[in-house]
């Protein structure tokens, strides 16, 4: 189970991630990871020198107005954001992972994530060729994972669609419904 979650959450472009969600019902166009925060005000911090900073900022704002809310640039942080240049050594353009790992799932205790032990990352090598809105879409997608949402392949118009060919740069109504169901 844990290994499957690792694949779902970490492989933005891997075929395995589609296989992992293929058996999930698609009627409600959101899926959940099986872990979430124990509170609805979720603090997120990104150091301002990072080149990814404006994308994380805009992506966090795009998730506003929900029952589960991102408290942007608040410390101590439940999760942090950064960018790395990993070239093609990984398949992901963005990842949500345990702090300091390449792509391991964050620790989950009693159905809740452990504050401070999660980070969201943009692989700058791959996203630097993207448009600004597409980069923001990858960032917002990772924040969706950080809420507790899993991939959903029902439509390219869903933010949690697993590939960067998604047609939205922020949460759609189905994505928001998923977060409101979680918190
Ligand atoms: Zn993803």
Language model: regions and residue ranges:
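N-terminal prepro-regions of secreted/extracellular proteins
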Residues: 1-37
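Zinc-dependent metalloendopeptidases
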Residues: 22-183
């Amino acid at each position: 189970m844990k290994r499957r979650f690792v694949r779902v959450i970490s492989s933005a472009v891997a075929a395995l991630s589609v296989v992992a969600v293929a058996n999930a019902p698609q009627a409600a166009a959101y899926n959940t990871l099986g872990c979430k925060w124990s509170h609805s005000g979720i603090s997120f911090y990104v150091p301002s020198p990072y080149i990814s900073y404006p994308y994380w900022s805009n992506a966090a704002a795009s998730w506003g107005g929900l029952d589960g809310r991102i408290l942007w640039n608040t410390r101590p942080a439940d999760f942090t954001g950064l960018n790395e240049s990993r070239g093609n050594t990984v398949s992901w353009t963005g990842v949500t992972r345990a702090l300091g790992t390449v792509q391991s799932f964050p620790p989950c205790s009693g159905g809740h994530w452990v504050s401070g032990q999660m980070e969201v990352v943009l692989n700058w090598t791959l996203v630097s060729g993207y448009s600004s809105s597409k980069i923001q879409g990858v960032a917002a997608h990772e924040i969706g994972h950080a809420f507790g949402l899993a991939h959903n392949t029902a439509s390219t118009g869903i933010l949690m669609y697993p590939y960067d060919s998604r047609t939205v740069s922020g949460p759609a109504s189905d994505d928001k419904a998923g977060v409101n169901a979680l918190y």
